[in-house]
């Protein structure tokens, strides 16, 4: 009986197996849905594994600390977290005029391009010529709702409306160091006289003959005698402890020769037929010859001689104080420009006062004495001198510093200009263009402690200069003599 009962139980178990299998194992579609919904539990030693952004923050919600572990970088973590928390606030491109958007939590920040401001860079800033010269390379003029840039003679305004492109090989103010620039077609020679103001009567000049022996021009008379030495300022302006100005580095330098062929004053080339100098130089000789392109007067290899046609001396020149110490020499034949002979650029009055004379340094050059009571230099010397504020300038001098003058030089360093440099250029460079800012005028000794060189302030005479140099345009041919 027992064996029969055991057999019956075995048969019953085998008959029930298919039904049990169908209850234990799910169909494939149901099983797949179940697996897709299953979340991963933290595995063993997970805290010791390197971060993974997909595992930490995409498969399940993460904390900022976990995101930092995944990125291992604070900036990347912040960028991710700002979007992760509440979406990308920059997706709508809220920043105008090329501004850059940075997402935040519940907000965003726009970094605006220059000239724009506001939360969305929606406001266009009003540019001012008083701030960085309005980004102009040369001249800046206020206009309605902004500024307008323009360029010096022989330059073209760039496509960006700010830069100035040299219009030829020998554009003004470019020495041999700054000549390797992009060139453009040179427009016809012309001068704009409309934008300059001047505190001085434009017609205040006296035209002199080429033979001006014993002539000192004042407001009252052209027939005064030669200036006598007294307790007046000394026209001993001078380049002391300067360096040699190599060929082409001071191409606007002119040298005035007396009737014996000796150099006695300097000058600045303004145009093919006009040279700027000091009024006090005019009474020092019977005849004047102008030399350009020379750097070594002992060799006489590179210079060109030019005869003088007319000389214009400011009618208000005061020999006793050197006020209005400015004159213009008109040549009989035009200067032939080259790499070594180039005019200095003439600035506008505003540009000179607000930009150039607020630079740290100016450049003075000449053939004058290299030390007080020393010999004149055979080679052209150049020195870089700092501008001196007006209050310091006036306190340092025993003589009047008028509104038509400014000081430059060092308080203690032995660098200055010296006798024989009078009338020469004080140049200021701005964006690789060199502008005439002063005329070497007078000083108390040479490079003396606590004393500075005094210069005629060219910005006071811009219109006066232009009224003269526009009277005659240069001829198409030049005729010059060799030294």
Curated annotation (Swiss-Prot):
Domain Peptidase S1: start-end pairs: 239-470
Glycosylation site positions: 92, 283
Post-translational modification summary for this protein: Gamma-carboxyglutamate residues are formed by vitamin K dependent carboxylation. These residues are essential for the binding of calcium.
EC number: 3.4.21.6
Localization annotation: Secreted
Residue ranges occupied by any EGF-like domain in the UniProt entry: 86-122, 125-165
Listed name of the protein: Coagulation factor X isoform 1
Species per Swiss-Prot/TrEMBL record: Pseudonaja textilis
Encoding gene, per UniProt annotation: F10
């Amino acid at each position: 009986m027992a064996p029969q009962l055991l057999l019956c139980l075995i048969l019953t178990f085998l008959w029930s197996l298919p039904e049990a299998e169908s209850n234990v194992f799910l169909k494939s579609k149901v099983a797949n849905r179940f697996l897709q919904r299953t979340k991963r539990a933290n595995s063993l030693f997970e805290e010791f594994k390197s971060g993974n952004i997909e595992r930490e923050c995409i498969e399940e919600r993460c904390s900022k600390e976990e995101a930092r572990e995944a990125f291992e970088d604070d900036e990347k973590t912040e960028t991710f977290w700002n979007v992760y928390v509440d979406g990308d606030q920059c997706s709508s491109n809220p920043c105008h005029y090329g501004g850059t958007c940075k997402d935040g939590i519940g907000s965003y920040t726009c970094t605006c391009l220059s000239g724009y401001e506001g939360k969305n860079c929606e406001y266009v800033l009003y540019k001012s010529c008083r701030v960085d010269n309005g980004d102009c390379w040369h001249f800046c003029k206020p206009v309605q709702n902004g500024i307008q840039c323009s360029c010096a003679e022989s330059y073209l305004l760039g496509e960006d409306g700010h830069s100035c492109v040299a219009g030829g090989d020998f554009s003004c103010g470019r020495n041999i160091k700054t000549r390797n620039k992009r060139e453009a077609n040179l427009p016809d020679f012309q001068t704009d006289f409309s934008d300059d103001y001047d505190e001085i009567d434009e017609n205040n000049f006296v035209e002199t003959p080429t033979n001006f022996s014993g002539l000192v021009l004042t407001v009252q008379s052209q027939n005064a005698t030669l200036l006598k030495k007294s307790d007046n300022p000394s026209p001993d302006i001078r380049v002391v402890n300067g360096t040699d100005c190599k060929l082409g580095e001071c191409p606007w330098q002119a040298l005035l020769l007396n009737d014996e062929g000796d150099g006695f004053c300097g000058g600045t080339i303004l145009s093919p037929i006009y040279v700027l100098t000091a009024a006090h130089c005019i009474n020092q000789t019977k005849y004047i010859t102008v030399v350009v392109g020379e750097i070594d007067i002992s060799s006489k290899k590179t210079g060109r001689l030019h005869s003088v046609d007319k000389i214009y001396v400011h009618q208000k020149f005061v020999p006793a104080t050197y006020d209005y110490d400015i004159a213009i020499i008109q040549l009989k034949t035009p200067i032939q420009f080259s790499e070594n002979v180039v005019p200095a650029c003439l600035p506008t009055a505003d540009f000179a006062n607000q930009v150039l004379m607020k630079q740290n340094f100016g450049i003075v050059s000449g053939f004058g004495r290299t030390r007080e009571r020393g010999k004149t230099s055979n080679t052209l010397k150049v020195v870089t001198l700092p501008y001196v504020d007006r209050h310091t300038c006036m306190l340092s001098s025993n003589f009047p510093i008028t509104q038509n003058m400014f000081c430059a030089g060092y308080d203690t360093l032995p660098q200055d200009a010296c006798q024989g440099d009078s009338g020469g250029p004080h140049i200021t460079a701005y964006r690789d263009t060199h502008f005439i800012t002063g005329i070497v005028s007078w000083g108390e000794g040479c490079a003396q402690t606590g004393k500075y060189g005094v210069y005629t302030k060219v910005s006071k005479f811009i219109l006066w200069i232009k009224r003269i140099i526009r009277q005659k345009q240069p001829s198409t041919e030049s005729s010059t003599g060799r030294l």
